[in-house]
UniProtKB/Swiss-Prot annotation:
<dbReference type="GO" id="GO:0003684">
    <property type="term" value="F:damaged DNA binding"/>
</dbReference>
<keyword id="KW-0233">DNA recombination</keyword>
<keyword id="KW-0963">Cytoplasm</keyword>
<feature type="compositionally biased region" description="Acidic residues">
    <location>
        <begin position="339"/>
        <end position="354"/>
    </location>
</feature>
<keyword id="KW-0742">SOS response</keyword>
<feature type="binding site">
    <location>
        <begin position="67"/>
        <end position="74"/>
    </location>
    <ligand>
        <name>ATP</name>
    </ligand>
</feature>
<dbReference type="InterPro" id="IPR020588">
    <property type="entry name" value="RecA_ATP-bd"/>
</dbReference>
<comment type="function">
    <text>Can catalyze the hydrolysis of ATP in the presence of single-stranded DNA, the ATP-dependent uptake of single-stranded DNA by duplex DNA, and the ATP-dependent hybridization of homologous single-stranded DNAs. It interacts with LexA causing its activation and leading to its autocatalytic cleavage.</text>
</comment>
<dbReference type="GO" id="GO:0009432">
    <property type="term" value="P:SOS response"/>
</dbReference>
<keyword id="KW-0547">Nucleotide-binding</keyword>
<keyword id="KW-0238">DNA-binding</keyword>
<dbReference type="GO" id="GO:0003697">
    <property type="term" value="F:single-stranded DNA binding"/>
</dbReference>
<dbReference type="GO" id="GO:0140664">
    <property type="term" value="F:ATP-dependent DNA damage sensor activity"/>
</dbReference>
<dbReference type="InterPro" id="IPR020587">
    <property type="entry name" value="RecA_monomer-monomer_interface"/>
</dbReference>
<dbReference type="InterPro" id="IPR013765">
    <property type="entry name" value="DNA_recomb/repair_RecA"/>
</dbReference>
<protein>
    <recommendedName>
        <fullName>Protein RecA</fullName>
    </recommendedName>
</protein>
<comment type="similarity">
    <text>Belongs to the RecA family.</text>
</comment>
Amino acid sequence: MAIDENKQKALAAALGQIEKQFGKGSIMRLGEDRTMDVETISTGSLSLDIALGAGGLPMGRIVEIYGPESSGKTTLTLQVIAAAQRAGKTCAFIDAEHALDPVYARKLGVDIDNLLCSQPDTGEQALEICDALARSGAVDVLVVDSVAALTPKAEIEGEIGDSHMGLAARMMSQAMRKLAGNLKNSNTLLIFINQIRMKIGVMFGNPETTTGGNALKFYASVRLDIRRIGAVKEGEEVVGSETRVKVVKNKVAAPFKQAEFQILYGEGINFYGELVDLGVKHKLIEKAGAWYSYNGEKIGQGKANATNFLKENKPMADEIEKKLRDMLLNNQDSTPDFTVDDNDGGVEETNEEF
């Protein structure tokens, strides 16, 4: 016991010295950390929030969203911004691709008058802006669109055709080391949009990879693979995309789940359509033939009419959403619209035919 008491005294002295040198909170017992419950922001898709396990994207962390062209990457991040703004949070969009459409952003519910936007000239400038905003503690959500467009200064000042091996990867690696701690301290969510490239000469396995080196893969708490798997049609007219998102890495809940939802052109994620689908699946909404009803009240004939009814009756939609979140997020053994994939968390191939 005497040895234990001596150890306790030595530990207390060491902790006191560390806190004196580096400040209070620089070391603590894990159970004393009041930030253990991760705060989240909704993605705008109920099935994706449930697939993520925590109810959305985690604050104070780095998130990577990648996929092929026109798969819905920017749309998903704009929906996250809209949800964050509705919760009273401040958001910034680093538009490295110089392609953000403010009209489309407004249609998705983004308050563009209060959205901070930067169109940096170089990758270093973009990442320095991210770091400055994170250190300020005044910005809650940062989006970088995209990693592939973060061009190192040396490459911009050089000639086309010059070789710049590993420059972008080194830049990203250094930025991740600086950003990770600042994001945690300020509880800022940083979302990187990324593109897919093909590795040359891969005979077996998946040839797909993401740009910017490996650092982002390690530092990201959540990685989402988003793909277009089909079209949404009204008659012969294509009005949207059927979209599948796979959670290929998740440090805040169980990974490898997936969600499917519709992205409607000019409207964004078909949230009320998800409510109908998940409500029927989990027996909150009754379906008899083509008719849908909730608590004995008919809400529409056909999914489109039921969706429009919920859109116009927000209290009922909010009630269904709350019941689904309570049922599915508090019981992580249940799997709604998604399945578990046995992969290693990398980019994976999909053989969907459109």
